[in-house]
Amino acid sequence: MIRVVHYIKEFFANIGGEEMAHVAPEVREGVVGPG
């Protein structure tokens, strides 16, 4: 099994911009971000 970890900026994950930079990494199921 291969696991892939992909980091997406907070902006594309609908968390916010620089003011939400303190949010810890999290796991989300399904498509998140652009495209």
Swiss-Prot record:
Entry's Gene Ontology molecular function annotations: glycine reductase activity
Chemical reaction(s) catalysed: acetyl phosphate + [thioredoxin]-disulfide + NH4(+) + H2O = [thioredoxin]-dithiol + glycine + phosphate + H(+)
Domain of life of the source: Bacteria
Entry EC number(s): 1.21.4.2
Stored Pfam families: GRDB
Catalytic EC class: oxidoreductase
Subunit-level organization: Heterohexamer of two alpha, two beta and two gamma subunits. Component of the glycine reductase complex, together with components A and C. PB is substrate specific.
Family membership: Belongs to the GrdB/GrdF/GrdH family.
Name used for this protein in its record: Glycine reductase complex component B subunit gamma
Gene (name only): grdB
